[in-house]
């Protein structure tokens, strides 16, 4: 009976307060793996000035990110929508459109999820920030994503 009591106290003190954190993290990781990602609806053809002679794009900086001036001239990434995906687990869904600046046509959408943590983290942490799906982090995402959006114009090939 001492063992059963000890297990009961363990469950009450540790498992119950953190159960929603554990289940929420599992669900969040599932959403990131199955529903988050990029949808490209339309590509943009760019003239020869944007391409090296070997066909590589000139619009990435040395760190692998899109050049700021190119981004400002060609794209509008405003208008992201955030909706509550799961109230039980405090998970939001963020859909970010990528539009051609001149026409405002939606070229692509990036969908990710934000996890705000379990009850204890949300209510007891003074500076709670959300975790987001990791696929959008770093220059490899930037290079891969924007390389899907832009291609050489027929005359540039």
Model-derived regions: residue spans:
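N-terminal export/targeting and maturation segments
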Residues: 5-68
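Extracytosolic and intramembrane catalytic regions of membrane-associated proteins
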Residues: 42-157
């Amino acid at each position: 009976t001492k063992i059963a009591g000890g297990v009961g106290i363990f469950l009450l003190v540790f498992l119950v307060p953190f159960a929603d954190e554990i289940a929420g993290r599992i669900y969040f990781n599932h959403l990131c793996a199955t529903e988050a990602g990029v949808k490209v609806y339309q590509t943009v053809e760019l003239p020869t000035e944007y391409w090296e002679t070997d066909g590589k794009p000139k619009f990435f900086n040395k760190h692998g990110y899109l050049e700021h001036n190119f981004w400002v001239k060609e794209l509008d990434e405003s208008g992201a929508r955030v909706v509550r995906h799961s109230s039980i687990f405090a998970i939001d869904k963020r859909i970010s459109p990528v539009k051609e600046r001149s026409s405002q046509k939606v070229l692509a959408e990036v969908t990710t999820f934000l996890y705000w943590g379990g009850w204890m983290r949300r209510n007891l942490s003074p500076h709670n920030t959300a975790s987001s799906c990791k696929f959008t982090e770093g220059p490899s995402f930037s290079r891969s994503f924007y390389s899907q959006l832009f291609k050489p114009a027929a005359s540039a090939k």
